[in-house]
Swiss-Prot record:
Residues 36-520 are lumenal. Its main location: membrane. GO terms for biological process: autophagy; membrane disassembly; multivesicular body membrane disassembly; neutral lipid catabolic process; pexophagy; phosphatidylserine catabolic process; piecemeal microautophagy of the nucleus; vacuolar protein processing. It is found in: Endosome, Multivesicular body membrane; Prevacuolar compartment membrane. GO terms for molecular function: phospholipase activity; triacylglycerol lipase activity. The gene is ATG15. Glycosylated. It comes from the Eukaryota. PANTHER family: LIPASE ATG15-RELATED (PTHR47175:SF2). This is Putative lipase ATG15. It is a single-pass type II membrane protein.
């Protein structure tokens, strides 16, 4: 009788196990180093290659000012010399002393001892940087970008996709609290006044117009402060935001008029048409909740508006630093303009408490790469949930923004949002005065041990109750469909008669907004 030999369990030899373990470790190491940089950005505790401190510091090097409105052709640059810094420091100390007599005076600088200074114009900023894989256009020359936005460059669908590239760039480390605070201070620096000193150089050709006496720091216009790190060859462009009485953005109100016009144009549904009592900032309103889309687009692109002005300032910075990495930042309106500029030219942009800028981005036809994943965006919006302007809740006829003449009707942001939950963490109530930049710096950015986590915005729709038509003529010449019945027996038939109304334009409206007078 045959007996089967007992089965034997096979054991791997030590050499075999060692080979498997070695291969596993090598695969893990290879996977780690092959991991895209944008997936490793969240390691805020790492101070290695993923998060590097800049070898040099950022110092204010120049200031740009650009006229808007009637003075939109004026564009100048001031080199920040030791004489300018000294005079600015004296003015800052004088202004600070005078401000101590007023309890509600907005401070010009942070009260935190870590960032204390007697002269904000002489402050040296330290920023940490990080690598970022960013999808942006291969050709970013301003002339090409402008022709692309204005529809002057024809491309096939294949060419459209081919012009986008995945670019390895250097960006500010938005997970580092100190870097976020420094960028916010750079944004607040654009609010600080500078004395009437130094030589302003014309960026454009000499003008035929006579420069108005009040132009510059005491007149209309937009400003950009340029900070430069000579060691790393990195530029930070800080754009001045809203300065207005009633709407707390800064401590002074030099450009209130044009700031309000541009705020209402950028962030309202249709030319700040909140009710019949409002004076609109453009003539694109057709009738109740109907707006001329092409008219809005033309208004935003006008050369005397802020978007064109900030693009011109960027051109000047690019000419001054052609090989440098350029980052943009700003607060409020300045933050929204920084985001629009970053979207236009593929620049890293960090905005603070900015209104929703998705709507103006679309109206300006700014480049949005097809199928862009959120982690490849280079735009970050920092804010807190007690600021109704940032959260998009400061709207309606009875809102605090409306009471001071602002139609802040947008809520949707592009890029990523980094929100501090001060309502639950600190017990704050929603208040327009929480929008102030130094309240944000002192009590929010410095009030938390870590920077807010940046996430993809939730699904959002602006102006859902408005109808936007291609043009005013399209509304007046639309085909009216009417149905009439034929009573011929034994069946009833229905036929459709199409009639076309003649093209006309409304030239007069009553107080309810209805058209009372037409012009052919």
């Amino acid at each position: 009788m045959l007996h089967k030999s007992p089965s034997r369990k096979r054991f791997a030899s030590p050499l075999h196990l060692g080979c498997i373990l070695t291969l596993t470790v090598l695969c893990l190491i290879a996977y780690y180093f092959a991991l895209p940089d944008y997936l490793s950005v969240g390691k805020s505790s790492s101070r290695g290659a993923m998060d590097q401190k800049s070898d040099g510091t950022f110092r204010l090097k120049s200031i740009y000012r650009h006229g808007v409105g009637a003075n939109h052709r004026l564009h100048q640059r001031l080199e920040v010399t030791p004489e300018v810094i000294s005079a600015a420091g004296m003015l800052y100390q004088e202004t600070t002393t005078q401000g101590q007599d007023f309890e509600d005076q907005e401070p010009l600088w942070t009260t935190n001892a870590e960032y204390a200074t007697t002269n904000p114009f002489d402050f040296e900023f330290e920023l940490r940087r990080m690598p970022l894989l960013m999808k942006r256009m291969k050709e970013r020359d301003p002339e090409f970008i402008e022709s692309y936005i204005y529809g002057e460059t024809y491309m096939t669908e294949e060419e459209e996709h081919a012009m986008w590239i995945d670019d390895d760039i250097v960006a500010p480390n938005i997970t580092d609290r100190g870097t976020v605070v420094s960028l916010a201070l750079m944004s607040s620096n654009a609010y600080v006044r500078i004395p009437q000193t130094g030589d302003w150089r014309n960026v454009t050709e000499p003008w035929n117009e006579t420069e108005p006496e009040d132009f510059g720091w005491d007149g209309d216009g937009i400003r950009g402060h340029v900070f430069y790190n000579e060691v790393e060859n990195i530029v930070v462009l800080s754009i001045k935001g809203t300065s207005a009485q009633g709407l707390p953005g800064s401590g002074e109100d030099e450009t209130t008029g044009n700031d309000k016009i541009n705020d209402n144009l950028l962030f309202s549904c249709c030319c700040a048409r909140v009710s019949y009592l409002w004076t609109t900032v453009c003539d694109c309103y057709v009738k109740s909740y109907i707006c001329d889309e092409s008219c809005l687009e033309k208004e935003l692109r006008r050369k005397d508006r802020f978007y064109s002005a900030v693009v011109d300032i960027y051109k000047g910075v690019l000419k001054e630093y052609p090989d440098a990495a350029i980052w943009v930042t700003g607060h409020s309106l300045g933050g929204a303009l920084a985001s629009l500029l970053g979207r236009t030219f593929g620049l890293p942009a960090v905005a603070f408490e900015s209104p929703g800028e998705l709507l103006p981005s679309k109206r300006l036809h700014l480049p949005f790469p097809p199928g862009l994943p959120s982690y490849m965006e280079g735009i970050w919006h920092f804010g807190h949930n007690a600021d109704p302007i940032f959260m998009g809740t400061c709207n309606g006829a009875s809102s605090s923004c409306s009471l001071v003449g602002y139609a802040m009707e947008t809520a949707c942001h592009t890029g990523r949002v980094c929100v501090y939950d001060v309502v639950n963490d600190k017990g704050w109530s929603v208040n327009m005065f929480n929008h102030r930049i130094h309240k944000v710096i002192d009590e929010v950015l410095l009030g938390y041990e870590q920077a807010a986590k940046c996430v993809e915005p939730e699904p959002c729709v602006d102006c859902y109750n408005w109808k936007f038509i291609p043009s005013r003529d399209w509304e007046s010449s639309s085909r009216l469909i009417t149905k009439t019945k034929s009573h011929a027996a034994p069946t009833t038939t229905t036929r459709t008669t199409a009639t076309t109304t003649s093209s006309s334009t409304c030239v007069g409206r009553n107080w309810l907004g209805f058209c009372t007078k037409y012009e052919l």
